[in-house]
Amino acid sequence: VTLRPPISVVINTLNEERNLPFALRSVRSWADEIVVCDMHSDDKTVEIARAHGAMVCFHERMGFADPARAFAIGQTRHEWVFVLDADELVPRQLAQALPGLITGGTADVFRVPRLNYLLGAPLQHLGWGPDQDAQLRLFKKSAVSITPDIHHFFHVKQGARERRLRSADVGAIVHFNYIDLTHFIEKLNRYASIEARQAFARGERASFRKALVASAREWLSRYFKNGGHREGWRGLYLTAMMSMYRFAIHGKLTELETGNSEAEVRRRYQAEAERYLAEYEGLHGESKAS
């Protein structure tokens, strides 16, 4: 019998006391090491992690998890790493498939299917179906390079072997994602700000044409190519929000290019307010004199 190499599980957290127990319960029976990297939670996340035997490390809050995830992977002891979000879990079917995958010698990096629950229901389309949303989650540390860029986190090194798994064969990570549209829009707004700042730092420039093209592509891809029209009202509204997300990135990038920051706008408004109020100067004295 070939013994599988040990696996380190990495989970990043920020106020995840509701979700984290499910994630930890799904990995504690097979993970050889659990590393929880917490971004200074205000709830009982850290206590829950330690109660389940996890090694806890800390990282500053960045507005998104990717920089902390890179740090957490650096804290692991083992070569094989499985990355899990705090609002995800690993079903038994997937857990049972892991030993065969890493001892089979077919790949150094695996893209694992993910079943997404959004707005209260599991999705099979929209680009968020299990086989549409395969994530790079199981890998040898030596086979990937890691960047802090949002949504562009892992990069497979040249020469590393990559394999995309199918949900019919191994199951899928279960992801309990956005609760409602309010939750969804709040996240999109935050992510759009981060993406705009990173694009600006790279020297990218916005244009109305680019915004229109990106928004239209999102519609065509999610609603038609990836079957969003089959998801009823969820498909329609989620596609609309994602299309608006692309527009928002370019809008926020335009603000950065023009120096139209919050501080600058507040300064401008204050100056305008003072200009209007200057019209009252002397009127109070005149009123009293009369």
Briefly describe each language-model feature range:
Residues V1-S26:
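N-proximal low-complexity "stem/linker" segments adjacent to membrane-targeting elements
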Residues P6, D32-E33:
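Residues at the starts of beta-strands that form the adenosine-phosphate
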Residues R18-P21, D43-H52, Q93-L94:
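Acidic helix N-cap motif at the loop->helix transition within catalytic regions
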Residues S26, W30, D38-E47, R61, ...:
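A conserved acidic beta->alpha catalytic loop
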Residues D32, V46-Q75:
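Conserved donor nucleotide-binding strand/loop of the catalytic core
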Residues M39, E60-R61, H78, D85-E88, ...:
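Short acidic donor-binding/metal-coordinating loop in glycosyltransferase active sites
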Residues D66-I73, F82, P91-N260, R268:
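Catalytic-site signature of metal-activated, phosphate-bearing donor transferases
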Residues N260-S290:
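Alpha-helical transmembrane segments and their immediate juxtamembrane flanks
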